[in-house]
Amino acid sequence: MSNSPIQAVIFDWAGTIVDFGSFAPTSIFVEAFKQGFDFEIDLEEAREPMGLGKWDHIQAVGRIPAVDKRWNEKFGRSMTSEDIDAIYAAFMPLQKAKVADHADPILNAIEVVNGLKDKGIKIGSCSGYPREVMDVLIPVAADYGYKPDYVVATDDLPQGGRPAPFMALKNVIELNVTDVNACIKVDDAAPGIDEGHNAGMWTVGLLLSGNEAGLTFEEYQAADEATLNAAREKARAKLLKSSPHYLIDTIADFPEVVADIERRLAAGERP
């Protein structure tokens, strides 16, 4: 029985609950471009469209003006769908081999999730990873203690992934949620925040644990306040374009947001 007006929280995976800094996908994108076409992209370029499904992500990287320029210089044309297919084909086995190495939960994530479960709040999740990558990640994350009630991968639904609301709404259906206004979507990337808005949910962006700050956990721990502030502001500038209801540093700060949304729902507010 729930003792909260919040029915469900839907979490992203990498950079939100596992894989501090969202390094599993970014490093693999760099490697996949190299392996598929002997073409160099840097980590910043690989991070730029994070949150999209991986095929769409590769397409978006190819459309970054600087990447498109270098691609044209090397191949005499812009990237085609066939090129994207080839890079995606290189990406998949690399990602499956590496994703388990980046399954460590982010600080306090398990405690926060278990606290939500104790309140009777359901835990949904969705990811920009395709199902065959999630099939590797889910059991490893479970060994660490992370067991969401439902998981949607970016290629599970024929309608597609983010920024459309379909993955979030699939969670709503499968978790038997009766009101999208009683749901919270938590993500470290803009497309996932947009997904939450499009699904009619409260949205929470993460500034320091995810893709936009791009810090390893070790860098985060060692950083002085000036370094953290610079990373925070870099992420804030990107995420504010999606107008999240809340911006917090990491999942460790989420319980205060939950308490505030509970108060607002009780007062009749809606997202």
Swiss-Prot record:
The active site is at 12 (nucleophile), 54 (schiff-base intermediate with substrate). CDD domains: HAD_PHN. Coiled coil: none annotated. GO terms for cellular component: cytosol. Mg(2+) binds at residues 12, 14, 188. Binds 1 Mg(2+) ion per subunit. GO terms for molecular function: magnesium ion binding; phosphoglycolate phosphatase activity; phosphonoacetaldehyde hydrolase activity. Keywords: Hydrolase, Magnesium, Metal-binding, Schiff base. Its cofactor is Mg(2+). Its EC number is 3.11.1.1. GO terms for biological process: DNA repair; organic phosphonate catabolic process. It catalyses: phosphonoacetaldehyde + H2O = acetaldehyde + phosphate + H(+). The keyword Chloroplast does not apply. NCBIfam families: HAD-SF-IA-v3 (TIGR01509), phosphonatase (TIGR01422). Involved in phosphonate degradation. This is Phosphonoacetaldehyde hydrolase. It comes from Vibrio campbellii (strain ATCC BAA-1116). The gene is phnX.
